[in-house]
């Protein structure tokens, strides 16, 4: 591996080892990094970092693509069922890979339940292969999920209950789900960055969940004086998640807290935390709200190609259903 990296200008065996230790295992990781990220590694100057990045981009053939090439790339997108046919219809078939989907809502609106359900659905072959088109089957072999829990709400027993409701083995779902408990934003960001290490180690990560995205940032950066710092850090975190989705054709799901809008006279009286940073970085954005009994309403209000729409689903002992 070190021998491969030495093909880059200014990278000798010693620098190659430092890059590998820092998690830069291939040209693509270097090509999609910033100069600032590489200069954090001891012994790498800004000039050297710039040369490495440009050379890596040439080797990876990064640059402009025609619309036809992008259309072909879109054919590798696959979709995963949410468990609700009505919600899947709003999403034109299910949760989409190569994208970040946000579910925001008040407590009890069903955010964490959807996250648990997707871990189960990932292990159901008929769900995965429902809309594969150009995806190679080997790419989807033994798919695994990563669940970064920032609020202590992941419940393995609930996953088992949902799996049994779906007719599959709960232990299999848990065996294929990596869980990390993040107590602060630094841990949360580190776990997200370490996902590439899991992939390089031979784990076929196809689902990444952050539950919830903004709680640690919200707790640490209080007051308007720290808002800019919080947003910059949150922006870097979202960039990491988008990169994972694009490079590894995986689905990224994030839940988000909401804040009241006291000046709202009509429409939704809450807004998702994170402002424009999250709004621009998320591909699909949902608001969840409670309805009668076990019913919940999911409203899609932002998407690059789908219309605004709503779906009603239920949270039962067996999981997410219509």
Curated annotation (Swiss-Prot):
NCBIfam families: PRK04301.1 (NF003301), recomb_radA (TIGR02236). Pfam families: HHH_5 (PF14520), Rad51 (PF08423). ATP binds at residues 105-112. It comes from the Archaea. SMART domains: AAA, HhH1. GO terms for molecular function: ATP binding; ATP hydrolysis activity; ATP-dependent DNA damage sensor activity; damaged DNA binding. Belongs to the eukaryotic RecA-like protein family. The keyword Repressor does not apply. GO terms for biological process: DNA recombination; DNA repair. InterPro entries: AAA+_ATPase, DNA_recomb/repair_Rad51_C, DNA_recomb/repair_RadA, DNA_recomb/repair_RecA-like, DNA_repair_Rad51/TF_NusA_a-hlx, Hlx-hairpin-Hlx_DNA-bd_motif, P-loop_NTPase, RecA_ATP-bd. This is DNA repair and recombination protein RadA. Involved in DNA repair and in homologous recombination. Binds and assemble on single-stranded DNA to form a nucleoprotein filament. Hydrolyzes ATP in a ssDNA-dependent manner and promotes DNA strand exchange between homologous DNA molecules. Keywords: ATP-binding, DNA damage, DNA recombination, DNA-binding, Nucleotide-binding. CDD domains: archRadA. HAMAP family: RadA_arch. The keyword Cytoplasm does not apply. The gene is radA.
